[in-house]
Amino acid sequence: MNEKQRIESGQVNPSDKKSEKDYSKYFEAVYVPPSLKDAKKRGKEEVKYHNDFKISEQFRGMGEGRKFYIRTYGCQMNEHDTEVMAGIFMALGYEPTDSTEDANVILLNTCAIRENAENKVFGEIGHLKALKKDNPDLILGVCGCMSQEESVVNRILKKHPFVDLIFGTHNIHRLPELLSEAYLSKEMVIEVWSKEGDVIENLPKVRTGKIKGWVNIMYGCDKFCTYCIVPYTRGKERSRRPEDIIQEVRRLAAEGYKEITLLGQNVNAYGKDFEDMEYGLGHLMDELRKIDIPRIRFTTSHPRDFDDHLIEVLAKGGNLLDHIHLPVQSGSSDVLKLMARKYDRERYLELVAKIKKAMPNASLTTDIIVGFPNETDEQFEETLSLYREVEFDSAYTFIYSPREGTPAAKMKDNVPMRVKKERLQRLNEVVNEISAKKMKEYEGQVVEVLVEGESKNNPDILAGYTRKNKLVNFKGPKEAIGQLVNVKIHQAKTWSLDGEMVGEAIEVK
């Protein structure tokens, strides 16, 4: 519904019409930058569950003869959100396209975790300006985490007024209404909720592939690490009910999926918001391991919530994979305190020791930030020493990127960028060294590989992943795609393994 229609329907008075620069009418709450103080108040509000999602008949057929294109940036949660939006588009009658030139609607599903991710999005918006000029009927939308930031919305309003639609992470289920308004309105349509949404079940999905599937188990994060924008862009922790998750996993198993990954900004906090029962991630994993699906992973973990019961359940093995991504961020207790991670170096190492005792062959990977405000040489050396002590299989490493509205962004930073880059290089040298050492141990071994498709570099070579998430390239028949096979490793590289398929595909019982 556009402004004129709203006035005619009596929903607003003409005198209430805002000036061109005042878009507050589109926001459910007052439009302000992320606030740590206000965000922490949110835990008092009850989360509501909705199992009756339906697309109104008035919107069905909206997409007949039209095509949509979604470009996804960032984490697995964004990929999952894209699957949901694609499902809604298809239910509206749209067809997918891989080309922006063929699309009638283009959505950029954005990431706000680092400045570099935001720059990529703004670069893409700039590239699409010419396309929009040539095709004025094209609907160009920006959604995802960046849309939850005041500075981003203001920048789009000021510098990219040709964008038609902006919506956030909490109202994806309102995509039909938002598209309808974008078609009718002559102004930019903006709907960003400061308050996080409820848990909406039965949303349609168009999954990418039939081999591996994402299963969202919770939304949001309440940890408020001082450097992180996610608690503001994704809202408070809200867990899906276990029965809904179990039903979804059973359905994927029946459809022939070989692997699922449980998703959440902090999966280890799963269930902590339930008021009617004591039920955590360990309980959920214990139920899921009984389902006839070969592989179950989860990401991402927070060390603070990684409890003994979860370790006990994971140690049962079976379809619960012994690959754990456990972000440490820094090896210095002082830096961890400034980050508000709520654990120190010793506690993290104790957790690692518990995991390795229960699962001696577990593969551990991590995330590390270098160049946090005022990080000293000694504190950085502590990160290097912790990495060597744990011997992670691999790591995602980053230079600290300040995010507007977070406490860390207000800290005075005396670490020059030159020093930050040098530290990142030194850390990556250690990461590569230990990864190469770990991969070398696979030479001569036979490993189970879930074959995902042809290698990106050579169509005559197949590629897949081991139970411990190691990339394997090997020679084998195309019929093996989508199957579990045994591969003998001949050569180890820093980040991948080369081998040859041995025997037939593994029968999954």
Swiss-Prot record:
SUPFAM superfamilies: Radical SAM enzymes. This is tRNA-2-methylthio-N(6)-dimethylallyladenosine synthase. It comes from the Bacteria. Residues 66-184 form the MTTase N-terminal domain. Its cofactor is [4Fe-4S] cluster. It is an enzyme of class 2 (transferase). SMART domains: Elp3. GO terms for cellular component: cytosol. Residues 440-503 form the TRAM domain. Its EC number is 2.8.4.3. It comes from Bacillus licheniformis (strain ATCC 14580 / DSM 13 / JCM 2505 / CCUG 7422 / NBRC 12200 / NCIMB 9375 / NCTC 10341 / NRRL NRS-1264 / Gibson 46). Its main location: cytoplasm. PANTHER family: CDK5 REGULATORY SUBUNIT-ASSOCIATED PROTEIN 1, MITOCHONDRIAL TRNA METHYLTHIOTRANSFERASE CDK5RAP1.
